[in-house]
């Protein structure tokens, strides 16, 4: 709630947010970003660009798709359809109406299109404009996002999960030696576009370079280089350096001495300086690059090599005869001994050869000479044959295909991200607008790949977050839109070509159904559009922040290896290392870290504080994984003095590759904002997370999402300080939209008058209608409760009402209960949980679950179905809960089998008897044959009817119940309108009064005469309408009054108009599915108390099932008589290593004891035994300096604050920065307890002390949605399987329990022959036997006969299908 420091009217402290004692040491300089902004920014800001003027819209999202698809021209270029702008109309129904009526919350997309018709002169070919038509065209309804970041599709709330996929760009990797038996590394490169064909380049085991397009058959890489227009000479010159060998008479060849080409080795011949003839090193001596560098520095430029050294080298240009200029050998050819003789014979003085050595291999040259294609045409045709096998090749088709593959922006798109990644990896500077491949790209990809093969550079890590990006909602829907618009483009071109273009309008050309069907399909069936997990507010928020590697264009869970699933150093501060599902999706579905955000390129960024010259400053900078690699980053817990200077000689820092180094303070570039930035929202709610084993923390964060909202919410005594943020951002609580004063409050709504003065001087009124007992997606109950009282001042974004699982604006998933760790008669064996009867009695873990049942009255072939109370063959007793229409009353208590809605269906007429004929002839009535098709409560359900909704088809007369519901809703709307009007009137007339008092009247009314001065008493005698009739002398005052009147009338009209529109919507009838006349929905609420078999869990991954409910008097109790609520097994701790729960228990024990101490002090103060100073001192000791602003207040307010502490002091222990063991001990000491946290406990059954001290404390426990009521069921009689005639299985089929093979063994082991016989026959599939048994039970006899089980007959039939005729013959004895 509103904090004291900025409270205007100094409200009493009761109307205030909860104050927690915080153990955190690190000051937060950055707030947690809005937890659902990832969804809202992506869709509303980047895709739809809602509420942005057309001229100011950027070329992204919907705007960019429409710009790229339009203009559309026909084949002859006569007609041209251009895009002008787009806008959205207001949605027909609001969010609440859509979810009630099972509709999609969507707004109509209106696109303004311009159709230009051209006149083309056939002789000259010149074009003239013949006509232009501009029109707004409806392009279908586009789903809108609700304020909570979800979509409503067909009445259900859905979330579009963000997808992690490999970023477009170029990636280099090797096979890790797995492919070739020798373990040789085979390097490859892959170009991944955003859309278009993939290009792979790869080495084979013989070091020849190949390429593939879309994983088709491989071709030589030089074919690709020739296809982009490179000649042999260009290829060789681009990839190799050249060196010239000069002839030295009778001595050999002189060649330039280049140290970088030399590797360490022993010389096979002398190293001789070519200029002086001096021997530098003898044969057999070792030369190293360092020694070579030394010789170079000493001025050695050329060295002498033997004649035969040239053998085996490759020519770097054509070898020509000096006399005739005839080509003797082509570029790239190897010099053989024969060729060397020719060189000597022709006295060729200079020979240029390629520099090929261990640092630069001959791979490209070898590939060139292996490749048969010698020119561009042959290369293109070869590529064409691979991609289009069986088609006749011609050069035009081949050229067109190759161009379309990589160089046509309509078919190939690297995206801006892909271009940036490509430029940075290849060291290019091509413009970011060029999103197709260029010739430079291809040349350089080959170059980098060859350099990798030569040992230069490193391969890419595909799991690095710089190489994986996030596709959020906006982008996913943008891709669907593009598909839909491309399909629509084809139909537009067809329609342009088909008809007379002169007469058509733009709307005749556009078929919006194509686009709508694609968008609808995405929202209904895509793997990434998911039914929202709405168990509690945390599960909602987590679902919206989820990152999935699965889905279209992503990985498949069967093929994903260990590396993809593993935690990567770049996940730090971006993806939570803890929260991921157990099972086959582990590591593929992740959660974003608390502080992470997604940048415009789709990379996840994490915030860091800047460090300048060893001093930490408050500037926060977000870095992506790529940028982070350039810096040294210290941890958030690095020691810092008051001035922000880093303490210590060395600071532990993270550097690229996830390594840690120790550096001096001035070398540090950034430090983490907070230790909490590493984990996700769910993990950040676990106190003492640092003391838990990772596996258990994973379970803890996952199980918090399964906690069902309880009737009474209770925030944890031991929290982490994040509870308030989660409650606020989840949308479960109601936030004030403006500052204001609370005018009215009840359980259904809150009315707030704002303080903000408008132009007209009248305040606006905000009415917040609260949700009462609504059903969530997971059948839990959504119920909101007001937190404010009349007269309270609230600030914008204050929480004014709690939602499900929230308590005073903080998330509250479970309850604080008193727990003891000790074994108790084996009832807490293997994680079982023993609970006290008090928990059931006081509804501590009771939850409400709401189920929806629907019945549809349809128009059938034989006539309409009817919803009625008049049902054939049903007793009056069965109809007791139904009204005269046949629909159940709200508030009725129902159980399985009760009728909820009476419905009859016409059935085909049976032949009529003569008597009936006579009766019909006399009375003229046709007694319809109808059958009962009423809606009954299914088995296993019981509860109270909380709501009934009736929907009638437009044009169908409404029944009395529908009219009553409608009347109720209209009254509610009228009350909202009247209250708002009343507040506005009150303000307007008080303003008028201020203006009129003291003015002189010009015109007279009955009660007042002209010339009189107006007084307050005089105005009290006038009606509201007469205020406006008064005219006064002051012209300025009259102007002001006129202005107020105009604004007042406008507001009044707007209110009435809004009311009329809503009423019209209610009265107009509903759009129902085809053939439906009426739909009735009944909502039944069931109270689930905690019972044996229910699953419970703590926040540390400690889960168990309730085994027994023990009477309070038998439970262990403390020395003061307090009975323990829950007994847990201490053996569940050591092996699981989630010690956090013990620290939580100890701190919880301190919490309740401190609260008792505070209440004792308050009692003593009230009895005048102590002064306020003693209480102040204790509070200061407990809360520290943070409490000073409360201690400065009046005595009453301090006592009010103490009373508000209630049953426990609230603590916040942030993850990785929370209370240490010593802090917990200090709190226990302050509370007057033993620092061990253990106490003497008395056995409730014997009244004796337990032998040793027991750990007791307050622990936060959750009830999970695995309730025993939804799992266990029993069957008496029910359906049988058609073939085997055995009872069906499973709760949904009302099936039996399978008595399997091992169960049969158990009976055999005990020799229970008769039990076994009846299990296998009459209780299973002996059809005749079970009929006879039924008969004998009805007659009251106790004997039964069993016959042949049906499964035996099935087996015989199977034998017969194998041509074995097995008969069962009875032989007479």
Swiss-Prot record:
GO terms for molecular function: DNA binding; DNA-directed RNA polymerase activity; ribonucleoside binding. The keyword Methyltransferase does not apply. It catalyses: RNA(n) + a ribonucleoside 5'-triphosphate = RNA(n+1) + diphosphate. GO terms for biological process: DNA-templated transcription. The RNAP catalytic core consists of 2 alpha, 1 beta, 1 beta' and 1 omega subunit. When a sigma factor is associated with the core the holoenzyme is formed, which can initiate transcription. Gene3D superfamilies: 2.40.50.100, 2.40.50.150, 3.90.1100.10, DNA-directed RNA polymerase, beta subunit, external 1 domain (2.30.150.10), DNA-directed RNA polymerase, subunit 2, domain 6 (2.40.270.10), RNA polymerase alpha subunit dimerisation domain (3.90.1800.10), RNA polymerase Rpb2, domain 2 (3.90.1110.10). It comes from the Bacteria. This is DNA-directed RNA polymerase subunit beta. PROSITE patterns: RNA_POL_BETA. Its EC number is 2.7.7.6.
